[in-house]
Regions:
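Active-site cores that bind ATP or allylic diphosphates and position pyrophosphate for catalysis
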Residues: 79, 85, 114-121, 125-131, ...
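Conserved short loop/turn motifs at secondary-structure junctions
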Residues: 42-46, 74-84, 110-112, 168-178, ...
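Intrinsic disorder/low-complexity segments
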Residues: 3-4, 8-10, 109-167, 602-610
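A glycine-rich helix N-cap at a beta->alpha junction
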Residues: 88-123, 168-174, 184
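Long, charged, mostly alpha-helical binding arms that flank functional sites
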Residues: 322-401
């Protein structure tokens, strides 16, 4: 799968993924049904994005990238009591990170503070094109920008890009509140909407029983008066709603006179206290798509039953064509994970994790902090594909994509997680050798580095057994192993403490067995990693694992009972000295152990330096191995 795409050029058909939605888009492109393909990613800013959102981001931005289109980032912010600027900022950062270098030239954003009223003369021109014009006039986009994208290549990677990014912001459904209100008034005037005085519980009961509201046949004049007074703040929350007048007996409950406006006396993160009536999702969604010129509105399957309402609202407002159309695909359900915002919020609020970006969380910020790359997430989304059928995706599919990606990019390093001291008695005291070690065997251009070797080294406790099991090929009394990049050593003596625990091994080395030596080709069955004791750098290593112990933790009962008590273990490791120069988010393979990343909690190059590393993933699927035993 190619990740490079010339700015402004669609991806060749033979290089595009194929699924039922892309097939529809390809047909529309061939028919020239729309001037340009225009998708959107519209999260509600009431929580952090998770890996399920990553699938949708990859689909919507992927289609824009492949067909030379645009994908708007829009905040679906119609519920003031649950939304916050914190979530807007995290969502924007996560989206930019995930599409960086892949589809960032397709990112639809707008000049900060601009709305349709301030950009266009009539409130219904192509908002996106107007935004591009404003950016060019402001110097945010160059005049010869070859793409019609309203974003620059605005990432977190450089001062110029940061400056441009600071002058852009997502689209907001709340920017359209004036227009949405006028659309609601238009429905009232056509006899297609009415103000209802039923309580929320009564409304639910009436709709369930296909029963007509006693307020359904109010006059247009009365409805207009009441709706105006609702807007003016004359009524308390929950006392009145505006409902679409469709069919109370419809077999589709979403068409049974659905609510399209409700009263909420609450401060809004974007509009302040200007409004006390707010549109419902189904009303704002389709009209926001229309205002922005969206062609393909792609949702998950639970919104399939909402599509008739989406179409009804657009058609009954007599809007100029073309109209957007909604398409649905199966959402991501991932094994050993929960993705309900409510349940993730419980984990955070009950301090069962350290926060939204805890590396065990399925949030994009958590996954990123764990060391997973955007490329790995996009590869995962590509591998699972797009279907119409819900099903559980094995987490091993995600883990395979992560390992495959990191194997190619991660620098190799020697680190001992649980050290035991080894003294090589026939190696000269005070001597240090610089040995050559490969940085990445998958990448010849990564070159080599020097690692120090001395008389005393650390090895893993698990690499020594006083009484070894069958087929144990690592170090044991009288046994030999090769220290990677160094010598073959033989265990001659054990040193134990007062409790009888082995605390030191005394070994001799075959000093001719190093590369280039007379016995370098001598074979032994085991090769282990090590770190020179006198040169080791201490690090806090956080060994993260799956957060839950079962594939479907929320299938029944309290999901928290399936939390993995061993999902985090913290050890003080001994690292080769090159890691003291590491920077946050650099990724490594600790040889024979797994993939690790420098955590943002690290205090680097300070007087009280502290190196902290997170385990991204083990080298092999240890869960599959355990499952085979049961």
């Amino acid at each position: 799968m190619s990740t490079a795409n010339k700015l402004g050029s669609p991806v060749a058909a033979e290089n595009r993924p194929s699924d039922f939605i892309r097939d529809i888009v390809a047909k529309h492109v061939a028919e020239k049904k729309y001037p340009q393909i225009h998708t959107r990613f519209p999260p509600e800013p009431n929580g952090y994005l998770h890996i399920g959102h990553a699938k949708s981001i990859c689909l919507n931005f992927g289609i824009a990238r492949e067909f030379g289109g645009i994908c708007n980032l829009r905040m679906d912010d119609t519920n003031p009591t649950k939304e916050d600027v914190e979530y807007v900022e995290s969502i924007t950062e996560d989206v930019r990170w995930l599409i960086n270098g892949w589809a960032d030239d397709r990112l639809g954003m707008k000049p900060k503070g601009k709305t349709p009223d301030t950009i266009t003369s009539n409130g219904k021109q192509d908002f996106y094109l107007a935004a591009v014009s404003q950016q060019r006039a402001a110097g945010i986009l160059p005049a010869d920008h070859t793409s019609s994208s309203p974003a620059t290549r605005a990432n977190e990677d450089g001062p110029a890009d940061k400056m441009s990014a600071a002058r852009l912001e997502p689209f907001y459904a709340s920017d359209y509140f004036d227009q949405l209100y006028e659309y609601a008034v238009a429905l009232i005037k056509k006899g297609k909407a009415y103000v209802c005085d039923l309580t929320p519980d009564e409304t639910d009961e009436y709709r369930r029983n296909a029963k007509e509201s006693p307020f359904r046949n109010r006059s247009v004049a009365e409805n207009l008066d009441l709706f105006t007074r609702m807007k003016n703040g004359e009524f308390p929350d929950g006392t009145r709603t505006l409902r679409a007048k469709i069919d109370v007996a419809s077999p589709n409950i979403w068409m049974r006179d659905p609510l399209i406006y409700r009263i909420r006396h609450a401060e809004h993160h974007h509009t302040g206290d200007k409004w006390c009536v707010y549109p419902m999702y189904d009303f704002a969604h389709c009209l926001s798509d229309y205002i922005e010129g969206i062609t393909h509105s792609i949702c998950t399957l639970e919104f399939e039953v909402h599509r008739p309402l989406y179409d009804w609202i657009l058609e009954n407002l007599d809007l100029p064509r073309p109209l957007p159309h909604q398409y649905e695909f199966a959402r991501l359900s991932l094994g050993y994970t929960v993705m309900s915002k409510r349940k993730l919020m419980r984990l955070v609020n009950e301090k069962l994790v350290s926060g939204w970006d805890d590396p065990r969380m399925p949030t994009i910020s958590g996954i990123r902090r764990r060391g997973v790359t955007a490329e790995a997430l996009r590869a995962f989304a590509y591998n699972i594909g797009i279907t119409k059928y819900n099903g559980l995706t094995d987490v091993a599919v995600l883990e395979h994509a992560i390992r495959e990606d990191l194997n190619k990019r991660a620098l190799r390093r020697l680190v001992v997680l649980r050290p035991i001291r080894v003294v090589i008695t026939n190696y000269p005291e005070g001597k240090t050798e610089e040995l050559d070690a490969v940085n990445n065997p998958e990448d010849p251009n990564a070159g080599t580095r020097k690692i120090p070797f001395s008389r005393t080294v650390y090895i893993e406790q698990d690499d020594f057994k006083e009484v070894p099991p069958p087929k144990f090929f690592r170090l044991k009394p009288g046994g030999e192993v090769r220290l990677k990049y160094a010598y073959i050593i033989k265990c001659d003596e054990l040193v134990k403490d007062a409790a009888g625990k082995t605390v030191e091994l005394r070994c001799t080395a075959d000093l001719d067995s190093k590369t280039g030596g007379a016995t370098a080709s001598r074979k032994v069955k085991g090769t282990i990693h090590w770190v020179s004791a006198g040169h080791a750098v201490d690090a806090e290593v956080r060994l993260y694992d799956r957060l839950f112990t079962v594939p479907e933790p929320d299938s029944e009962g309290d999901f928290k009972k399936h939390l993995n008590p061993h999902s985090l273990e913290i050890v003080t490791a001994k690292c080769e000295p090159s890691l003291k120069d590491a920077q946050p988010e650099l990724r490594y393979q600790f040889e024979r152990l797994g993939y690790f990343v420098i955590d943002s909690d690290s205090k680097l190059k300070t007087q009280n330096s502290k190196l902290i590393l997170n385990r991204t993933i083990t080298l092999k699927d240890t869960w599959a191995k355990e499952a085979q035993k049961t």
